Amino acid sequence: MSAARSVRDGRHRARIAALQLLYLRDVGGGGADEVDAAIERFWAENSASPERRRLAMSLFDGTSAALDRIDPLITEAAANWRLERMAVVDRLVLRMGTYELLEGSAPTAVVIDEAIELAKAFSGDDSAPFVNGVLDGVRRLLESAEPPRPPGTEEPLPR
């Protein structure tokens, strides 16, 4: 295996782990102590290199901490879809992909392609095109001059 493919594969596996951790937090509920215990159990049951674990935790922590920036972007890009009505895995893939687009450490095309692959692997048949469309919309919003406003802060339209 080439070095580039090995790095790519390691980053892909880190994204899978981060998605699983986000799912544990989202579906498991509970407080911070329960989430921390679930994360410790996850790592005890799933071996990973220190680099993969670091990247997975960075994606998990970054996504979790930036939801106030992430969710308005997804809501704006996913016209006619409310976050709470999206399939859980789709919502989590979109959140993590949006975080990566905001962070900018990976090329946009790679982030969107990885999100599509996660949707194909862990969600329904219609998920990949949905994730592709929404993240492309997020990409356009981020490239535009004015980012979307959080819900409820829109200025009234002129009459």
Language model segments and positions:
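N-terminal interaction/assembly modules
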Residues: 1-159
